[in-house]
Amino acid sequence: MKLATEKKTTRQKLSIAGMLITMGVVYGDIGTSPLYVMKSIVEGNGGIRNISQDFVVGSISLVFWTLMLMTTVKYVLIALRADNNGEGGIFALYTLIRKQAKWLVIPAIIGGATLLADGMLTPAVTVTTAIEGLKGLPINGNVLVSNQREVIILTVTILSVLFFIQKFGTDLIGKSFGPIMLIWFTFIGAIGVMNLMGDLTMLKALNPYYAIHLLFSPENKVGILILGSVFLATTGAEALYSDMGHVGRHNIYGSWPYIAACLVLNYFGQGVWLLQHKEVAAYQNMTDFNPFFEAMPAQLKIPAILLATVAAIIASQALISGSYTLVSEAIKLRLLPRIKVDYPAKLKGQLYISIVNWILWAVCLAVVFYFKNSAHMEAAYGLAITITMLMTTILLFHYLGRREKRWFLAYVVLLFFGAIETIFFIASAAKFMHGGYVTVLIAFVILFIMFVWYRSNSIKESNTFKSSTVSLLAYKRQLHDLRNETSLPLYTTNLVYLSKPQAEPRGKNMVKKNILYSILDKRPKRAQVYWFVAVNVTDEPYTAEYTVDTLGTDYIVSVQLYLGFKMEQKVNIFIRQIIHEMIHNGELPAQPQHYTTIPNREVGDFSFVIIQEDLSPETQIRAMDKVIVQIRLWLEKFTDTPASWFGLEYSDVFVERIPLVLGRQKAINKYHLKRRQEES
């Protein structure tokens, strides 16, 4: 049976409006790369005084082929086809193949952790780079930003405002993102054409020979490490894949050629400008110039900087929203603790996670204050995302081979792109000592939390006593008698317990013994209907289905909810829908209420019991496993409450604490008490 939900349409057909939305949602990161890619390449080689024609042509060739191979071929042509009901990204890919091998969770959590870590650096890099364009630039005779300190203040202000407005939703301003990004791409493409017309010989950079030649040329003073800067041109490719569910694959197919053309034209235009100005004395000793801004007419610089700032904000917004989505997916897949997820806008796909928002804000500001300028940030940027891309390649290999049975393509992806990404990783690893350790540290913290959460789930499942799970059939008679025991007060009309999903068919109608203990032993709870509800997270993103088994009664209901990994788990709403359907179908009797404000009310009151586990001192498992479980229980103190997570904030909820006993229970019978004989 299906549940009534407001499902977000993830597979949109190709349309002008769809492609416009795509420009605002998908291309923010990769679209702002021209702000710092060539700047980073030139600075890495010692400045404009150390570049030559071969160096510039080779650099542009490296950027071009990186965009073509990594973004166009791997992600647009191959990865976008590996979708989970229209959803993309590393976790969506993982859900497609996780049943094939348990170890695939390793590349999934590593890739997810590094993608989140990289997303924390992106807003700081893009906004700082854009604002630096204002430094020393006269506006109406006055210099608005005269030094780096003022750049930092303005950057921090913009980022703080951006993060502050997240809780109110961004759907209103989000409607303008697409048109603004269309203007941005058209503008940078036009500037590129204008410069390229000055020296069409730059088109020889289309030949990959110049890219390969530069890697081994003496003109290149950093050797293969130049790829650490080149890689910045494609860091947004992973975000492109992750955001597929918001806009649809076909809208990316339709819009990418235009986006790619504008990016390539701008890079080529910057290359021409560098060749034409490498001998200009004014630039010889400049250490912080940006060829992106220098390559345009003076009268366009101020509009360009303002437009770049807005584009950087849009790119940052896309990364922030992407982080919310990534965390939400990880929670549903039981890879991260449950934390409160809000939906501030009318659009169901727009999330807001308060704790994630403020952690991102704090990290972004810390990055700005620590690195102080974009050059230092660029030195740290990109290392984490190379790891994400490698992990995606591993998962793509298993998807193409094991699921699609296209083994030739699978090995091409693994060997070809795996080799390229390994080289990029080696080149980017040199950034570790220049600030790359920041993103590695952030990624490690996220990875540690993911590992603890995933591993503790495995420990609990493998060490819980088999006797801790019982069949409802064995207690059917007792529940019947308790229901009809008039000497006990009616606890509630509908008593609902959230139980753990059990494997079918052996686990059918099986629940944890502590649930029956709560009903029968701890304090007998008399109710008209006993509900045992299990939430199963499916590999599809927007599944909303359920099954029921009444065990041939009208007082026991075993419900299995099947919800997609992107669905809200609003149990209260779903249970009320189910009981109305069951009463309408004659599976349950009506529950008329004598005292009510609702005319013709058929459903009685609900009480929800949530059982909270505390690690018992009687637990006997390996010391390391015990530490992991204890860390998990500590983390749970900072997570969302089950009542909030399951949409029960305004329901009648009771929390019962029970000991969590794992492994073999300590024998206490060997300690036999002997009664003392009292002296007469």
Curated annotation (Swiss-Prot):
Cross-referenced HAMAP family: Kup
Annotated catalysed reactions: K(+)(in) + H(+)(in) = K(+)(out) + H(+)(out)
InterPro entries in the record: K+_transporter, K_trans_C, K_trans_N, Kup
Function statement: Transport of potassium into the cell. Likely operates as a K(+):H(+) symporter.
A cellular-component GO term for this protein: plasma membrane
Stored Pfam families: K_trans (PF02705), K_trans_C (PF22776)
Subcellular location, record wording: Cell membrane
Descriptive protein name: Probable potassium transport system protein Kup
Signal sequence range: none
Organism of derivation: Latilactobacillus sakei subsp. sakei (strain 23K)
Key words of the record: Cell membrane, Ion transport, Membrane, Potassium, Potassium transport, Symport, Transmembrane, Transmembrane helix, Transport
Gene that encodes it: kup
Topological type in the membrane: Multi-pass membrane protein
Family from the record: Belongs to the HAK/KUP transporter (TC 2.A.72) family.
Cysteines paired by S-S bonds: none
Transmembrane segments: 16-36, 60-80, 103-123, 150-170, 177-197, 222-242, 255-275, 302-322, 351-371, 380-400, 407-427, 432-452
GO molecular function list: potassium ion transmembrane transporter activity; symporter activity
